[in-house]
């Protein structure tokens, strides 16, 4: 491991001195590192590589991170599902809007479909104007263009775009004349009673991959020839010179811009280059029109199509004006969608880790009580719920003793006479995902016991034998000055409430909901 380039290894030091724990941003400049930086020593322990540097700094790297392959930014063909229409014979990626809003797992599945397959359809979005903006805002931000924050796709008397007519539209990407191009497009169907007007999608990455396989020279021409995409009307003049197929430095397909209507005059010093471009352009266009690549479906009122505008080409069949066809659309960007998806996955992983504690260590003895640790915390949460407590206090009651599993000392150490300060270690661990409205009652719930024993006559007599013992280890009842100071703390009242539920939650065999009952509540509180 120590054969790794030293400046690369040190530049990626994850310690709090080198990176802000809240956001991972570096706290030093690369030229702050000394000349001749070298590894002075290293050891492997507990799944980590520990490095002592020649300047005295110490770093600790997870071995799993050192072995991890380059993930990229998720924008290239790597890891994507390149598809033909037959791949969706069982059905296209879709979900109910109400389920998407209510269930983080359902939202993650929809966003992952857009990332991996390039699109998804939400069903049951209210068929009223401007709802498409709400869909975009559910995962990101609306991209405003010269068409406004949203646009209507219907027949216009004086259209400035073929989209606003009833004619058929061949597969294309939108706004190729804009740099950066809007990377996501949303189309929400309000009405579709006309004959025709079916929607179509083509996987541009798949078409480009076919071209690369069948005619690699043509593929290479389209990756290196700048194409002027232009748009103008009375108020707008836009141009972007980009290749039809854009690849990353490793040669992986990253973006397709394809819109015959918007291509301006391609120029080259050598006419042979123009011949090569047009031969490649025509071949690529023919591939996009192959029947096996054409996925056709009909949007009904309430359907909202979300798709990757840097990958998928969308199309429309002609329609008759014997009925009405009205869609509203808007643009958004993949960075927000990918960010939201990553956060959803991060939260799900955190909830899985907490659930594993309840099912694993939580199934063990709870400090000499007649219930397990998990039963105790679930009973506390159930008591909070029964009392009509706000969600953040139900969460605090559920998680108040999570610190017994973290920190230098375990819960068993507390019973052996060492204060494991589980309220602090638990709050610190939970602070990675929850705000102070959850973590501070957790942090203060031990102090709340000491406070109540000092100020509330008869409270101490209610303590169980184990709780009485831990009280002595944790400092005993507060004195008058300590109690007054505690009462002034911002989270004191909530901590006292959690403490009362804590003391109630020691009944052997009491029925309670399981951890999964509280997962949606916790997910809604995570940040």
Identify the function of each model-found stretch.
Residues 22-30, 118, 172, 309, ...:
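Residue-level detector of functionally special positions within alpha-helical transmembrane segments
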Residues 58-60, 119-123, 144-148, 435-443, ...:
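Short secondary-structure capping/junction motifs at helix and strand boundaries
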Residues 45-47, 57, 115-116, 385-391:
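Short, solvent-exposed loop/edge-beta patches enriched in aromatic
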Residues 27, 31-38, 155-160, 165, ...:
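Aromatic/His-enriched, Gly/Pro-containing loop or helix-boundary segments
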Residues 347-527:
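Metal-dependent phosphohydrolase cores
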Residues 2-103, 112:
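Motif-centric detector for short Cys/His coordination patterns
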């Amino acid at each position: 491991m120590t054969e790794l380039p030293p400046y690369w290894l040190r530049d990626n030091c994850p310690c709090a001195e080198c990176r802000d724990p809240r956001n991972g941003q570096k706290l030093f400049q690369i030229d702050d590192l000394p000349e001749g930086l070298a590894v002075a020593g290293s050891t492997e322990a507990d799944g980590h590589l520990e490095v002592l540097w020649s300047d005295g700094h110490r770093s600790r790297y997870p071995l799993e991170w050192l072995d991890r392959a380059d993930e990229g930014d998720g924008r290239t063909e790597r890891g994507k599902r390149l598809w033909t229409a037959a791949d969706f014979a069982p059905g296209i990626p879709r979900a109910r809007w109400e389920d998407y809003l209510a269930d983080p797992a359902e939202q993650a599945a929809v966003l992952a479909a857009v990332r991996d397959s390039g699109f998804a359809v939400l069903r049951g979005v209210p068929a009223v104007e401007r709802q498409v903006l709400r869909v975009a805002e559910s995962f990101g931000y609306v991209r405003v263009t010269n068409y406004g924050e949203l646009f209507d796709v219907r027949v216009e008397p004086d259209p400035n775009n073929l989209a606003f007519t009833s004619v058929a539209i061949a597969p294309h990407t939108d706004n190729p004349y804009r740099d950066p191009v809007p990377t996501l497009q949303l189309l929400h169907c309000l009405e579709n009673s006309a004959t025709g007007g079916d929607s179509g999608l083509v996987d541009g990455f798949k078409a480009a991959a076919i071209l690369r396989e069948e005619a690699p020279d043509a593929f290479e021409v389209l990756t290196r020839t700048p194409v002027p995409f232009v748009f103008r009307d009375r108020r707008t003049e836009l141009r972007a010179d980009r290749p039809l197929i854009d690849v990353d430095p490793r040669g992986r397909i990253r973006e397709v811009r394809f819109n015959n209507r918007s291509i301006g005059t391609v120029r080259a010093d050598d006419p042979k280059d123009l011949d090569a471009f047009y031969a490649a352009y025509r071949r690529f266009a023919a591939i996009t029109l192959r029947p096996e690549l054409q996925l056709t479906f009909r949007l009904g009122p309430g359907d909202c199509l979300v798709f990757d505008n840097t990958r998928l080409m969308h199309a429309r069949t002609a329609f008759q004006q014997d009925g009405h066809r009205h869609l509203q659309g808007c643009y958004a960007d993949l960075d927000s969608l990918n960010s939201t998806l990553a956060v959803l996955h991060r939260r799900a992983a955190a909830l899985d880790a907490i659930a594993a504690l309840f099912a694993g260590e939580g199934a063990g003895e709870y400090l000499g009580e007649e219930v397990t640790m998990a039963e105790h915390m679930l009973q506390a949460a159930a008591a909070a719920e029964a009392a009509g407590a706000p969600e953040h206090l139900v969460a605090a009651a559920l998680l108040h003793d999570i610190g017994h599993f973290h920190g230098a000392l375990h819960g068993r150490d507390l019973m052996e006479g060492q204060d494991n300060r589980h309220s602090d270690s638990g709050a610190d661990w939970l602070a990675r995902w929850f705000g102070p409205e959850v973590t501070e009652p957790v942090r203060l719930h031990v102090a709340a016991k000491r406070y109540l024993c000092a100020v509330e006559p008869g409270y101490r007599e209610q303590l169980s034998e184990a709780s009485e013992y831990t009280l002595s280890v944790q400092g005993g009842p507060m004195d008058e000055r300590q109690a007054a100071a505690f009462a002034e703390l911002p989270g004191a009242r909530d901590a006292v409430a959690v403490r009362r539920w804590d003391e109630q939650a020691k009944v052997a065999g009491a029925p309670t909901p399981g951890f999964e009952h509280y997962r949606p509540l916790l997910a809604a509180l995570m940040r």
